[in-house]
UniProtKB/Swiss-Prot annotation:
The keyword Coiled coil applies. Residues 1-26 form a coiled coil. This is Uncharacterized protein L567. Gene3D superfamilies: Protein of unknown function DUF2935 (1.20.1260.120). The keyword Coiled coil applies. Pfam families: DUF2935. The lineage of its organism: Viruses, Varidnaviria, Bamfordvirae, Nucleocytoviricota, Megaviricetes. Keywords: Coiled coil, Virion. It comes from Acanthamoeba polyphaga mimivirus. One of its GO terms (cellular component) is virion component. It comes from the Viruses. It is found in: Virion. Its main location: virion.
Length: 320
């Protein structure tokens, strides 16, 4: 059983126990392996609403553990990539603030997720105490404020280092998504599905610029995902990526061909699953030094975790 199976199993047990306790008081009585079908079936069968009674606390812990880690890594990457002193130092300070928070509330309690781990295990969830949402929001707002300032500076044309505007904008949007997941309002299934597609497209757009110019085939593949024009490469040269895509499917992903929600979610899930596998295999090439790029192995795993988590979120939405 993998991490998210355990997470969902424990969450279900907690909800059942909570309901039993509620009923007894009223009546006077008594956290992956990609492509694993068993995993997918169990995940779908246990899908629950985020604010279902008793479940919100555990979802908050998992959201903060995941996205807090992503924010911490974003800020370290920005610190390393910036040259302008104030922005560079501010990125490091924000990084350290997240690191201290995660150390105090997660790492020091034995909750140290692996490089590809996108969800906490049942044992890890049990170790975490109550989280102060005000503290979490303070860190998120601080991060959004910093990234917003950086985006504005970069869009003005000022050179401050080796971070380009689209990368910083992508990081800002993830921070804003994190804030909404913690505080609401809840995304509708359509809103969140469209956000996932946008996220994946912009993620691949940023990744494309980090590949060595000699990696022509990989650049073409990554750019096809970024521009959502995979059909131009589908089936060519017997490459595993991209898979078979039609221009109609791409139009749906780009929002140019309005369809019912079920169709949108089906095509979006296909896109997300394929990118998750692509990110996994690309990360393995980076780890084994088979790909020329300036992508640090930590960033490769960072990207995989996001694709994997969003894929599972789409599967959950589809099961509701």
């Amino acid at each position: 059983m993998n991490h998210y199976d355990q997470y969902q199993k424990y969450k279900k047990k907690y909800l059942d126990l909570k309901n039993q306790l509620n009923n007894s008081s009223q009546y006077g009585g008594n956290c992956g392996n990609y492509g694993n079908n068993q995993f997918n079936n169990q995940f779908n069968s246990q899908a629950t609403n985020r604010y279902q009674t008793g479940g919100a606390e555990f979802d908050l812990k998992d959201e903060v553990a995941f996205w807090g880690r992503q924010m911490m890594e974003h800020l370290l990457l920005l610190h390393l990539g910036l040259d302008e002193e104030e922005l560079k130092n501010s990125a490091l300070q924000n990084h350290m603030d997240w690191k201290r928070y995660l150390t105090e509330n997660f790492f020091s309690k034995g909750v140290n997720p692996g490089p590809d781990q996108a969800f906490l295990t049942t044992n890890e969830l049990e170790k975490i105490g109550l989280l102060n949402k005000n503290v979490v929001n303070g860190l998120i707002d601080q991060t959004i404020q910093y990234k917003s300032k950086l985006v504005k500076t970069l869009n003005s044309g000022q050179w401050v280092g080796w971070i380009y505007p689209a990368m910083a904008q992508h990081m800002l949007e993830e921070a804003e998504y994190f804030k909404r997941k913690v505080n609401g309002p809840d995304y509708t299934p359509e809103q969140e599905t469209k956000f996932v597609v946008h996220h994946h497209s912009t993620e691949m757009g940023a990744t494309t610029q980090l590949l060595d110019p000699t990696e022509k085939d990989n650049i073409k593949i990554a750019k096809s995902y970024a521009d959502i024009c995979m059909s131009k490469l589908s089936g060519r040269n017997k490459k595993p990526f991209p898979n078979q895509w039609t221009s109609q499917e791409e139009a749906i992903l780009r929002g140019q061909d309005p369809v019912d929600l079920a169709t949108l979610m089906r095509i979006s899930l296909k896109y997300s699953r394929e990118l998750t596998q692509f990110a996994k295999e690309t990360g393995q090439k980076i780890d084994s030094k088979q790909l020329k790029s300036i992508i640090h192995p930590v960033l490769a795993h960072h990207i995989f975790r996001e694709f994997y988590r969003f894929t599972k979120r789409l599967e959950q939405l589809g099961a509701q």
